[in-house]
Amino acid sequence: MSPVLSESQLRDFKHTLESSKIPFRSEVRLGILSSFKIGGVCPVIVEPEISSQVSEILHIFSKFDIPWKILGGGSNLLISDHPDNFVTLRLSGKFKEFVSLGDGKFKIGAATNTTPTFRQISQLGYTGAEFLSTIPGWTGGAVIQNAGCYGGELFDLIESVEFLRNGEVFVRKPSEIKYGYRFTEFLNQKDSIILGIEILLKEGNLEEIESSLKDKRDRRNSSQPENKKSAGSVFKNPKVFREDGKEIKAWELLDQAGLRGQIKGGAQISPEHCNFIVNLGTATASDVHYLIDLVVDRVYQTSGILLNREIEFFGDIP
């Protein structure tokens, strides 16, 4: 575990941010920025509004030897109870915007909220992105994980990805990026920051689009714990198939292992949908981590299948 940032280190760092007119906030409880509502207080959260500020912040991080992590919509994260040994970077300003470029092409900022953004784009009469209106979080995070559901993936629609790496802005086509099921090369490149994407959609029938939006919304609502704080599906489907060719789902393995409803502290494996862990109101990151380890061990013992996490850890979680 890394040491807590010193007061003098933070003081000089914040003074430089002020001089550079880069927006930031101090002593922010990160749990309020996550769908899990779990996470402790971070000493500083920096909120750049334009690309040049992002580049400048990375230079400042290096100058003061400040460890940092980037936080998006917080929908697929388990945040540490003690995120006090790093600074959080969270895009704002122009990164929260999307614009039509005409002929079905849209430029979408990394800090746009996926659900309303792709619903609005679909309601303009363009089809192909309806499934993304059911995925919570921000577009940047959706890019990193190649988010998808109902047979669609974000990279099916992407024309280009704009990202910053080592202080330089790049624009890459999907053919120039490694990606797959719930994976892109950005997952393993912590020095890369997604800035935005361009997508291309086809014109469609608005009545059919509205019907598709409603169908996917209803399916999503029926497959998740209702009105519960969670980070979405905890485990990836293992890509293992039965003799009849049907895919074995992660939730089935949890259910067969007798894990439905298991509780640790304020966290519970959902009785309704057991590939979800829910915050009953007082859950800590350690509570959730305990249940994750329990699932991995028990499922392996009962099925011989090793499950991989879909949610990401943010900070040190014992």
UniProtKB/Swiss-Prot annotation:
Record: active site: 182, 233, 310
Highest taxon in the source lineage: Bacteria
Coiled-coil intervals, chain numbering: none
UniProt protein name: UDP-N-acetylenolpyruvoylglucosamine reductase
Biological role: Cell wall formation.
Native source organism of the sequence: Leptospira interrogans serogroup Icterohaemorrhagiae serovar copenhageni (strain Fiocruz L1-130)
NCBIfam families found in the cross-reference section: murB, PRK13905.1
EC identifiers of the protein: 1.3.1.98
Molecular-function GO term, any one: UDP-N-acetylmuramate dehydrogenase activity
Family: Belongs to the MurB family.
HAMAP family reported for this sequence: MurB
Any one of the GO BP annotations: cell wall organization
Keyword tags: Cell cycle, Cell division, Cell shape, Cell wall biogenesis/degradation, Cytoplasm, FAD, Flavoprotein, NADP, Oxidoreductase, Peptidoglycan synthesis
PANTHER family, per the entry: UDP-N-ACETYLENOLPYRUVOYLGLUCOSAMINE REDUCTASE
Lineage, highest ranks first: Bacteria, Pseudomonadati, Spirochaetota, Spirochaetia, Leptospirales
Signal sequence, start to end: none
Biased amino acid composition, Basic and acidic residues: 212-229
GO cellular component: cytosol
Family matches, as SUPFAM superfamilies: FAD-binding/transporter-associated domain-like (SSF56176), Uridine diphospho-N-Acetylenolpyruvylglucosamine reductase, MurB, C-terminal domain (SSF56194)
Segments of this protein annotated with the region Disordered: 212-232
